[in-house]
């Protein structure tokens, strides 16, 4: 009898995991079909590594989880830039880094507003705020290019762009 109960519980757990995995894969596939800028592999990999995304049962909950992930990436990147500002190797690009830090603060505000939009089912508002946040990594990199300087955070900005693109693409599917 205990074996049967254990088997039923295991199969329910496995089914729940499979459902979340299917939601992630299907959502990433549909989003990629609509927006080729989105990397299908990056989408699936980043969402399957996130516990909130893995627990999502609807596209809306996946949008919330992926937006929170993007906000966490910005917070992490702000920490990296704060460390770079203290590093003597980057003293010739302090102003550029400060400008990027300001951009990240704006993006953080945009994502906070987008989360509120999503929770209230204002997907158009969420789209506007996610789009504004999506511009930030490029704006930061553009500043370095215009100044003919090398950005020490190009890779991080690329990852941030891809990360923000996920909830934006999903919001367009709601």
Curated annotation (Swiss-Prot):
One of its GO terms (cellular component) is apoplast. Glycans are attached at residue 129. CDD domains: PMEI-Pla_a_1_like (cd15795). GO terms for molecular function: pectinesterase inhibitor activity. Pfam families: PMEI. The keyword Glycoprotein applies. Induction: Induced in leaves during infection by Botrytis cinerea. It is found in: Secreted, Extracellular space, Apoplast. It comes from the Eukaryota. Disulfide bonds join 28-43, 100-140. Disruption phenotype: No visible phenotype under normal growth conditions, but mutant plants have enhanced susceptibility to infection by the necrotrophic pathogen Botrytis cinerea. InterPro entries: Invertase/methylesterase_inhib, Pectinesterase_inhib_dom, Pla_a_1-like. Keywords: Apoplast, Disulfide bond, Glycoprotein, Secreted, Signal. GO terms for biological process: embryo development ending in seed dormancy; plant-type cell wall organization or biogenesis. Residues 1-20 form the signal peptide. SMART domains: PMEI. The keyword Secreted applies. Its main location: secreted. Pectin methylesterase (PME) inhibitor involved in the maintenance of cell wall integrity in response to necrotrophic pathogens. Modulates PME activity and pectin methylesterification during infection by Botrytis cinerea and contributes to resistance against the pathogen. Belongs to the PMEI family. NCBIfam families: PME_inhib. This is Pectinesterase inhibitor 12.
